[in-house]
A protein has these predicted regions:
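A short, structured surface patch at a secondary-structure boundary
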Residues: 1-43, 47-54
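Short beta-strand->loop
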Residues: 10, 49-52, 73-77, 127-141
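Alpha-helical, coiled-coil/dimerization segments enriched in small aliphatic residues
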Residues: 12-17, 135-155
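Short, hinge-like loop/turn segments at secondary-structure boundaries
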Residues: 25-28, 67, 90-92, 143
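Extracytoplasmic substrate-binding proteins
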Residues: 59-133, 154
């Protein structure tokens, strides 16, 4: 979406947690932890973007490859990782304008926000809640924790 192209299938959290504006033709693959690979193949994607950190995504690589579907795995833990992924995806779609708009322009805003941090280094507790648990998360290896660290928070 941010890199161009059309979404043909997505996990249910795309609607439930992320609130993405996906039209009725997008196939709901079910749980992010147990996506329905048959439904994904039936949606006939040209290209699948998957998480390198989700066991179910990694497990479906062979099946998708055998079906002739190209899969790219990403580990996005911070803004630099996001920019790298966006760069690759906009190169694939040929939409350099979207790399500028959704990458470099946003990077300027991020840098402006970092400059606004007052240096007080507040102590925070970052909790990630899911339907079955709540976990305290550190500042490394996840987008929100990295953002808090960039703003000078002690997590």
């Amino acid at each position: 979406m941010l890199a161009g192209g059309n979404v043909v299938a997505a996990a249910n959290d795309s609607w439930e947690s992320l609130g993405l504006d996906l039209d009725g033709s997008v196939v709901n693959l079910g749980s992010i932890l147990e996506p329905d690979v048959e439904q994904l193949i039936a949606a006939e994607p040209d290209f699948v973007i998957a998480s390198a950190n989700t066991d179910a995504d990694v497990a479906m690589e062979e099946t998708l490859t055998q079906a002739g579907i190209t899969v790219a795995y990403f580990d996005v833990a911070n803004f630099e990782d996001y920019l790298n992924m966006l760069s690759i995806c906009t190169q694939i779609t040929g939409r350099d304008d979207l790399y500028q708009k959704n990458g470099l322009d946003v990077q300027k805003e991020v840098e402006e926000m970092k400059q606004r941090a007052d240096g007080s280094n507040p102590t925070v507790l970052f909790l990630r809640a899911a339907s079955s648990n709540v976990k305290a998360k550190g500042s490394d290896g996840n987008v929100c924790g990295e953002m808090l660290a960039d703003l000078g928070c002690v997590n």
